[in-house]
Regions:
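Eukaryotic intrinsically disordered, low-complexity tracts enriched in Ser/Pro/Thr/Gly and charged residues
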Residues: 1-9
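Short, charge-rich amphipathic alpha-helices with coiled-coil/heptad character
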Residues: 9-37
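Short, well-structured hydrophobic secondary-structure segments
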Residues: 30-63
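Short amphipathic alpha-helical segments with coiled-coil-like heptad repeat character
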Residues: 50-51, 115-118
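Extended, amphipathic alpha-helical coiled-coil scaffold segments used for oligomerization/tethering
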Residues: 55-99
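Amphipathic alpha-helical coiled-coil segments
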Residues: 94-116
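Conserved small/polar residues in nucleotide/adenosyl-binding loops
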Residues: 121-128
Length: 128
């Protein structure tokens, strides 16, 4: 499930036929259910990505501090001795594996914000 696809779905679902408001209002619970299911799915995907981030963060910390298994350094040599905490943090901040997962988490956050905005639209329909 990606943001573009969800936005396209919403663009189609948000169209209201003003000549048939009764039937349109009956669709609201179905749409709410549909987008709440998507919201829950994306939330779980984000949580899985957060879990991945935590595991990879530990692996990369061990890598930069010289505590990773020897075979890791055979596959991906690291020629520096990093001793200071802020130097380790700089390497961690620039690490491709970590930034890739961090971007995934941010993407899920943006998707969830969009879905929250969609849910507010449904709530307004119930107020009228």
């Amino acid at each position: 499930m990606n943001l573009d696809k969800i936005q396209e779905m919403w663009e189609r679902d948000a169209v209201i036929n003003p000549d048939n408001l009764h039937d349109e209002s009956l669709k609201i619970p179905q749409l709410h259910s549909k987008y709440y299911t998507v919201y829950n799915t994306v939330t779980l995907m984000r949580e899985k990505a957060r879990e991945q981030y935590t595991k990879i963060r530990l692996e990369r910390h061990n890598y930069y501090t010289g505590k990773a298994p020897a075979e890791v350094y055979e596959e991906e040599p690291f020629p520096y001795k990093v001793r200071e905490k802020d130097a380790i943090q700089r390497h961690m901040d620039a690490d491709e594996k970590l930034t890739k997962i961090d971007m995934k988490i941010r993407y899920y956050d943006v998707t969830l914000k969009f879905l929250e905005a969609v849910s507010y639209t449904h709530l307004r329909a119930h107020e009228t």
